[in-house]
């Protein structure tokens, strides 16, 4: 039972070890909850204004609630060049849930705002904002709170040149496996921190997750310290000896 059918599709040039190698956890949610969210934080054509777009999937199961409220807070450090503290509030009625139904029991609520001035994220200046999403019931009680770091950035290719926030960049990258010489595919957070700091000391600005999505914490570190990520899907086959 070491391998499944999927093992041969997700089969890279790699040490093939068995066992649970990343965090596994069980958690409970209220019947009405934040099922998922997706945030897109870009820049306008002049690379000054921030374009904040957020989609929140609200799961309410079989029974439509009468009224819900979503609150979204967005802010950065007070000492930032362009400090902001935004609070977006949206009251959600039964009809809103019906009109925005994604599938049975789940509806998507959208937020969008143009922010006059933002501190853009780049490898040289990895500016991040704190985003918090609160779901409240009809009495104003907090049902669930989730959050994420957000970086405003725009990536594009113009005239054959890769640009971030309108500025040309030179990729100085490495490939990285989720692998530790002592613990195999179980990589500690401390080792990830050591990896990323070593990369920065050698002026590396890009990492390729060869050949599969990495641990979630690794992406958080790349956001925090300023590394571009070439993220690969776990879809590659090789012969096994």
Task: Label each residue range with its predicted role.
Residues 1-221, 225-229:
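Secreted/periplasmic carbohydrate-active enzymes, especially glycoside hydrolases
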Residues 171-172, 236-241:
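Active-site-adjacent "subsite" loops/lids of carbohydrate-active enzymes
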Residues 213-215, 235-238:
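Solvent-exposed loop/turn segments at secondary-structure junctions
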